[in-house]
């Protein structure tokens, strides 16, 4: 599981002054730990950029029971770190990408059917939408991109850019 945790969390203002957004607590638990607990046995690749040193120290101290490695993207934008993370996967290996601030419901399950999936929001507004097989930077409550992507292999992302925002067609 790849967790995109590189943003500054600017909309959280003072909460991220001394820590990355993924360590902001929700009900006394850092957001990233919801993913750790949901997928206890998974191997996590965490893409970090802001306050990486704080994240590393915190996870080594309080997350040692989970299997993770932290990478810092060498180029700009969301896609740079994702591209670097998937380069370590086998060509036919399925994987999931999720944003660090996504807390999945207890009954969420990964689909068992093969294929690629995009998490779509039906009840809260997202900054990006998924319309006609494309990402568009238009807020939506009905077709908002919720920050969860499941791929059966690396093929769907083979032509992505080296830097910038995640923009794939499915």
Predicted regions and their residues:
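Residues that form generic nucleotide/phosphate-binding pockets
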Residues: 58, 159, 169
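Conserved N-terminal catalytic core of the sugar/cofactor nucleotidyltransferase
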Residues: 3, 11, 25, 29-99, ...
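Short secondary-structure boundary/capping segments
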Residues: 14-15, 86-87, 110, 140-141
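Alpha-helix/helix-capping structural signal
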Residues: 7, 50, 154-155
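Conserved core of the sugar-phosphate nucleotidyltransferase
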Residues: 103-164
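A short, conserved alpha-helix in the catalytic core of glycosyltransferases
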Residues: 164-170
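N-terminal nucleotide-binding beta1-loop-alpha1 segment
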Residues: 1-17
């Amino acid at each position: 599981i790849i967790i995109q945790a590189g943003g500054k969390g600017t909309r959280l203002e003072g909460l991220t002054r001394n820590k990355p957004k993924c360590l902001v607590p929700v009900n006394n638990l850092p957001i990233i730990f919801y993913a750790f607990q949901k997928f206890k046995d998974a191997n996590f690749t965490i893409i970090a950029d802001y306050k990486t040193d704080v994240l590393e120290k915190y996870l080594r101290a309080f997350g040692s029971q989970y299997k993770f490695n932290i990478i810092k993207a060498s180029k700009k934008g969301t896609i740079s770190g994702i591209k670097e993370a998937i380069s370590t996967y086998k060509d036919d290996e399925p994987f999931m990408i999720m944003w660090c601030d996504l807390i999945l419901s207890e009954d969420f399950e990964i689909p068992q059917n093969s294929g690629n999936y995009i998490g779509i929001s039906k009840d809260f507004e997202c900054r990006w939408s998924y319309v006609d097989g494309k990402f568009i930077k238009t807020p939506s409550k009905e077709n908002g991109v919720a920050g969860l992507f499941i791929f059966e292999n690396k093929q769907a992302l083979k032509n992505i850019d080296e830097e910038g925002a995640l923009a794939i067609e499915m």
